[in-house]
A protein has these predicted regions:
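Nucleotidyltransferase catalytic core that binds NTPs
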Residues: 1-93
């Protein structure tokens, strides 16, 4: 069973994020959604709690999403904690 972490700012969650999760669900059995702490980042629109709640609402019925995390640490350490061997990344532009 392949588990992956998708760590992103989610400020706000966009259709691009949804597309990445949908595409990734074809490759991974389980996906952990992680919003990263970007406190103090210029232009921040939502608090960490609000961003995590948005992710939960957007991905609520997605069959591959197994957990939601808010992280202050590195994504690599989260992968170790949740026993994920893969990280999902998006590319802009």
């Amino acid at each position: 069973m392949a588990r992956a972490v998708f760590a992103f700012s989610a400020d706000p969650v966009t259709l691009g994020h949804v597309d990445i999760v949908n595409r990734s669900s074809k490759l991974f059995d389980e996906i952990v959604i992680a919003t990263v702490n970007s406190t103090g980042k210029p232009g921040e629109m939502f608090t960490g709690k609000q961003r995590l709640e948005m992710c939960y609402e957007v991905f609520l019925n997605h069959p591959c999403i197994v957990d939601y995390k808010f992280i202050n640490d590195t994504a690599v350490n989260l992968c170790k904690d949740v026993r994920a061997k893969f990280m999902i990344r998006g590319i802009r532009g």
